[in-house]
Amino acid sequence: MADQALVDQVSAKIDALAAEMIDALSEVVRIPSVNPKYPGQVYDEVVGGEGEVSKAFARHYEGIGAEVDLFAIEPGRENAVGVIKGAGGGRSLIYNGHVDVVPVGDPANWTGGDPFSGKIDGDRVWGRGATDMKSGIMAQTFAARALKECGIALKGDLILEAVAGEEVMDHECGVTATVKRGYTADAAIVSEPSSPPSPLAVVPVSPGLLWFSVTASGKATHSSMRGNSIRAGGDGAAVGVNAIDKGILIFNAMRQLEEEWGLTKKHPLFRPGHFSIHPGVIQGGPHGVMVPFFLSEFLTIDYCVWYSPDDDPEAVKREIETHIHRAAQTDAWLREHPPVVEWKLHWPANTPDADEITAVTVAAHEQAAVGSRFAGAPDIVGFAAVEDATFLTLGGVPAISYGPGDLRVAHADDEYVMIDEVVTACKTFAVAAMDWCGVV
């Protein structure tokens, strides 16, 4: 654990800097930094916001005295890295977060007005990116600043990172680009919002994500022929087959498998039932004529699969494909016209060898949160979603997560972050750096 006198000193400094930190957070929230590759975005109209936010963080890094590297794999999508060199003899640590955000949806649904207002309203800051995750990056940045202003020198290097690309797994443009550029360390803490189930939990693992589609085909004919195609004594498939009926068989099979997972897929750091097979998009109809006057020629369902970090993703794929195949065998048409499965994306689970940095973060939170509503030992949980910690771990840097904010308001209308979470997270980051890197 960090020396208590130093903890008290740096905590007092962060309290003194808190108003400035929240103002700085508001400023970066006001910069729209929607990921230009997010579905539905026109790239050339959106690109550039990520870079502007990274440049803002780079200015903060320069003010701390860090060695700053501002670079882009794609123009307008800069990553900012600030290296605070240690005196030697300590362990190195990366503090990482992503600057890109998801689209705001319909601005009319935001009750506070401008989704990028960055409004400071009593106990919270409003706006897209407040929780996910500009608050976390700012807390890490001001933790480093507080250490410097307290005259606390670390033995190990502290590397601050604000990266692009996370929201669409564009890690080659963001976090992986930093690793390939040589920015590695003995451990990393990604400041993703680590609630739910409780604020400021410590997150040593995350699930994996698979995106796939399954398409059932049909045979178009006039909708008045439905009875002839499905009733006993009719012409059956010879006249037509409604793909929607066939696709629903697959939908029901996936729902059955998901219910089985609720009983069989367990992990000690995840709530029961977390691992799921979510039908997120359904498209179907007659090709080219989206009216209900035909028997539909296709039904495609896109699924988002959340699987346990203990599971082999290839085994998960085989299980899903086997279940679809078995369902198809119950139907004469599907036996002859099997559903087509397409695997579209895989975001691997994060399973780092990170017991030490996890323990350091837990202890740092306990020291930093004294006297706050977050006092005591933090929960240790699995991350609900996926994150860049995966790609740091895959790049040889064991990475966990801890940060202010709540995933239940991330990607939602009226996103916000609680100010006291940002302040306590900032203190935790400062204490963790002292403990992990060592103090001269």
What spans do the regions from the language model cover?
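Fold-level recognition of mixed alpha/beta catalytic cores in primary-metabolism enzymes, strongest
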Residues: 130-131, 135-258, 295, 411-427
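A short, acidic/glycine-rich surface segment
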Residues: 102-105, 171-172, 196-201, 262-263, ...
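Acidic/His- and Gly-rich active-site-bordering loop/insert found
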Residues: 2-128, 149-154
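Residue-level signal for inorganic ion chemistry
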Residues: 28, 32, 192, 247, ...
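Metal-dependent amide/peptide-bond hydrolase catalytic core
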Residues: 1-9, 13-16, 69, 74, ...
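Catalytic metal-binding/acid-base residues of hydrolase active sites
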Residues: 34, 100, 109, 167, ...
